[in-house]
């Protein structure tokens, strides 16, 4: 008898594979996420979620997609892998398997391959029972987690948050957070249960003196510090709003895993202990809230968290020999501090004051933060746009941001795993960040003060990395062309947002010093372009005029002319340079499709780079000399299509400076960027630089490509990478120019990479976590709707390519919803007041 083989399943598989292959343009279709934009995360999309909770410049902790606490960064620096053993639990009396940690299942990536996992993850709470299912919803600054388990007859919701109130920077800079645990009885009987919250004293330091202190309805994890290390001292408080809270201030003291074992034994029995505090070295603590729920009833337990770490060892920057008295006239100025101190250390004397303020003002701060949430999410904008903007507002709550006692901001570019990354409120990175100037304009203006006063010398040279504490800093390195010229445009923007003429009058002379330095240094022959080598955000110097930095130059010239005319100043010099530069950019630097760079390295004021090879002490390899002679200086882009190639016109547009360069040619450049640099699949893309931003079957926008040839052997050092901050910049600019769908394509590709499976949706990284450039995403509001408020003229501008819409706007004095209904503009105020004399419809 011959066996018959059924080939039907095999044929079906082959046909399916061929269809997938053909429908993906010759690429195997990627494993697309089930996550819908601006909606719930569940399943594997929970794995990498870590949502920052804290205050601006105050530190943070993160609420993970499961409900776990991690990234505990309250010691004035990031601690990305600091996941202390702290957890909430519920124990329902009288049922089997009724005790569980109030979290979803531990993600698989934590079980093996991370530090300590090879030894079994000792000391973590991973081994305790958890809920079968979880789902996570971000509604910044709130994160909501629903937990479900067939063993537990309760509907359970966790809500984590920290105060965030646009126009109220102080209450948005508090070292606090909260998690509300809500329980609803789904049965027809009373449910008796005990809620608990447990923690080791993760504030303790080696050779320090740590204690767990008493606090009404809670506890304080305390470290008095290590000798000669005041920055090691600090307090972390956890407390509830429940008068019946019971606290065990000292777990069982023993070896091995005795303390955690005994603590869990108590929790598991639905019991509680009330051990008093001990003098030192208590291994851990647990608070308990026993409660009874009638059928259908709901109980919410408010868990409030506060911390106080007043000292640091942070100091950056070389002191300037030029010290202007005007910088330090203010007795509250932080410039004379030996080390940085956080803003809250000047407002509160200790942890008890923070606790009292948080407890007293909790409901008011919740109401105002929830108002912002509700107004922001009351929108008709595409979900992917709202997700992108809101996800990157978390940067403001991350350790990327610091704030001095005098109120001034100082920022990193991003966060390395255990320290800030790239110091000094770097001007050419923070150029892109558009959230702060609209949500907290007064804080943003402190950055202008830093740039144009302590960071600018008498010649007008601006150090693009300011000192910490903020003080006069030596200008011994190159100025950054894009950073310094962008700062001039940002002065214009901040003036139009605030409407503060006196502020403009005061800073304008410093702005004149700055532009004159730029002209003298980079355009000494008055061509209207930057010919001399000019440092920029790619951490190299461009030699010869290029579209990117020349567009900054034109924007700065136009900004200073507009401000000068308003102040009745003579700006004819700048107007003439602008005209010459615009003509040069639109002809000499435009190849008919996009803007390019004309590489120059001979006949400049700058020394010929070939001279370096004549000095034997430089010890430069021979192959580098040959490459210079063949191609010119390293790290240029030449004939390339640069995604940032008209960046200055985008900065100008978000600042309210329109038509800096011919809009038809700008649009042509942006469409070329979309055509040549946007890749839906990067599998065949070669990147010897930093590939993990986007790689393999992921999509993304490359920084540069050379569609017409001419790629140099060593183009600028990041040219093959994908940066989210540039993706949003290009996307919002495309939208402004009427190419809305192309912009949305780029935003979707970006957010698809940050869907929680591989990357944290709330941590867009570049040179570090929570990278500031990603706040270019805030410009998507203006890009999609054309909404911009001018406080000088009290006019609301709307340039809608989409018809009727509802969106969000925040200004110096308030926030609300803005849009069009039946073709007519409207503004619905929610907080504060925005005076609108008239709407300008473009």
Task: Identify the meaning behind each predicted range.
Residues 2-11:
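Bacterial N-terminal signal peptides that target proteins for export
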Residues 21-22:
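C-terminal motif of bacterial Sec signal peptides marking the signal peptidase cleavage site
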Residues 26-109, 388-392, 397-399, 404-405:
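Beta-strand-rich N-terminal accessory domains
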Residues 27-34, 40-45, 49, 144, ...:
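Acidic/polar, glycine-enriched structural segments that form the non-catalytic walls/loops
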Residues 57, 68-70, 76-158, 163-169, ...:
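Non-catalytic C-terminal accessory modules of carbohydrate-active enzymes
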Residues 91-94, 98-102, 110-121, 185, ...:
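Aromatic-rich carbohydrate-recognition surfaces in CAZymes
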Residues 178, 289-294, 301, 422-429, ...:
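C-terminal substrate/ligand-recognition segments
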Residues 382-416, 442-475, 521-545, 586-723, ...:
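Extended glycan-interaction surfaces of carbohydrate-active proteins
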């Amino acid at each position: 008898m011959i066996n018959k083989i059924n080939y039907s399943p095999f044929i079906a598989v082959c046909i399916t594979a061929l269809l997938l292959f053909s429908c993906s343009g010759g690429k195997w279709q990627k494993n697309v996420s089930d996550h819908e934009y601006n909606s719930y995360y569940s399943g594997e999309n929970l794995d990498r979620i870590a949502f920052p909770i804290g205050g601006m410049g105050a530190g943070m902790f993160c609420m993970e997609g499961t409900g776990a606490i991690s990234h505990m960064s309250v010691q004035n620096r990031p601690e990305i892998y600091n996941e202390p053993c702290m957890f909430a639990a519920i124990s329902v009396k009288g049922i089997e398997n009724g005790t569980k940690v109030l979290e979803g299942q531990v993600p698989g990536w934590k079980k093996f391959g991370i530090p300590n996992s090879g030894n079994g993850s000792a000391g973590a709470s991973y081994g305790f029972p958890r809920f079968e299912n979880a789902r996570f919803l971000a509604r910044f600054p709130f994160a909501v987690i629903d937990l479900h388990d067939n063993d537990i007859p309760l509907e359970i919701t966790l809500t984590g948050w920290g105060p965030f109130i646009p126009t109220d920077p102080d209450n948005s800079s508090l070292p606090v957070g909260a998690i509300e645990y809500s329980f609803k009885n789904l049965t027809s009987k009373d449910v008796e249960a005990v809620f608990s919250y447990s923690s080791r004293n993760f504030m303790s330091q080696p050779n320090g003196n740590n204690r767990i202190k008493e606090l009404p309805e809670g506890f304080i994890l305390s470290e008095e510090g290590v000798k000669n290390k005041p920055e090691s001292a600090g307090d972390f408080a956890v407390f509830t709003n429940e008068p019946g809270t019971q606290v065990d201030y000292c777990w069982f003291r023993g070896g091995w895993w005795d303390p955690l074992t005994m603590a869990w034994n108590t929790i598991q029995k639905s019991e509680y202990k009330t051990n008093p505090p001990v003098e030192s070295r208590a291994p851990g603590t647990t608070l308990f809230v026993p409660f009874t729920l009638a059928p259908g009833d709901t109980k919410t337990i408010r868990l409030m968290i506060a911390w106080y770490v007043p000292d640091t060892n942070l100091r950056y920057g070389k002191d300037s020999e030029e010290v202007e008295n005007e910088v330090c006239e203010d007795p509250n100025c932080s410039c004379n501090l030996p080390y940085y101190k956080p803003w809250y250390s000047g407002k509160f004397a200790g942890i008890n004051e923070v606790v009292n303020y948080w407890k007293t003002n909790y409901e008011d701060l919740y109401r105002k933060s929830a108002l912002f949430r509700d107004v922001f999410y009351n929108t008709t904008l595409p979900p992917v746009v709202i997700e992108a903007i809101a996800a990157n507002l978390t940067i403001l709550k991350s350790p990327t941001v610091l704030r001095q006692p005098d109120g001034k901001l100082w920022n990193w570019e991003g966060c390395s795993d255990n320290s800030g990354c790239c110091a000094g409120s770097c001007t050419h990175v923070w150029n892109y960040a558009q959230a702060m100037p609209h949500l907290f304009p007064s804080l943003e203006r402190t950055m202008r003060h830093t740039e144009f006063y302590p960071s600018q010398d008498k010649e007008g040279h601006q150090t693009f990395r300011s000192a910490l504490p903020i003080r006069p800093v030596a200008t011994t390195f190159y100025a950054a062309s894009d950073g310094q010229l962008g700062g001039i445009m940002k002065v214009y923007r901040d003036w139009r947002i605030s409407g503060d003429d006196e502020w403009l009058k005061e800073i304008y002379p410093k702005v004149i010093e700055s532009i004159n330095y730029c002209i003298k240094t980079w355009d000494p022959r008055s061509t209207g372009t930057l010919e001399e080598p000019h440092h920029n955000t790619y951490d190299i110097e461009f030699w010869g005029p290029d579209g990117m930095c020349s567009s900054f130059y034109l924007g700065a010239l136009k900004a200073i002319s507009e401000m000068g005319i308003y102040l009745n100043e003579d700006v004819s010099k700048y107007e003439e340079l602008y005209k010459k530069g615009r003509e040069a950019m639109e002809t000499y630097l435009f190849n008919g499709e996009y803007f390019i760079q004309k590489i120059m390295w001979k006949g400049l004021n700058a020394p010929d780079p070939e001279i370096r090879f004549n000095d034997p002490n430089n010890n430069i390899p021979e192959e580098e000399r040959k490459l210079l002679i063949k191609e010119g200086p390293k790290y240029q882009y030449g004939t390339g299509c640069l995604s940032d190639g008209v960046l200055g016109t985008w900065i100008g547009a978000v600042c309210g400076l329109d038509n800096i360069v011919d809009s038809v040619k700008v649009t042509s450049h942006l469409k070329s960027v979309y055509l040549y640099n946007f890749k839906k699949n990067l599998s065949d893309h070669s990147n010897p630089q930093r590939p993990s931003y986007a790689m393999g079957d992921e999509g993304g926008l490359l920084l540069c490509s050379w569609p017409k040839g001419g790629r140099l052997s060593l183009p600028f050092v990041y040219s093959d990478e994908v940066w989210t901050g540039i993706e949003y910049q290009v996307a919002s600019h495309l939208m402004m120019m009427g190419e809305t769908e192309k912009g949305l394509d780029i935003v979707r590709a970006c957010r698809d990479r940050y869907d929680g499976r591989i990357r944290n949706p709330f941590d867009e990284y570049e040179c570090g976590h929570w990278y500031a450039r990603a706040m270019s995403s805030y410009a998507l509001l203006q890009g999609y709707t054309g909404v911009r408020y001018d406080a000088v003229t009290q006019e609301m501008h709307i340039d809608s390519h989409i018809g009727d819409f509802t969106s969000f706007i925040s200004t110096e004095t308030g926030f609300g919803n803005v849009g069009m209904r039946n073709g007519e503009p409207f503004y619905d105020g929610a907080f504060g007041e925005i005076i609108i004399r008239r709407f300008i419809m473009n």
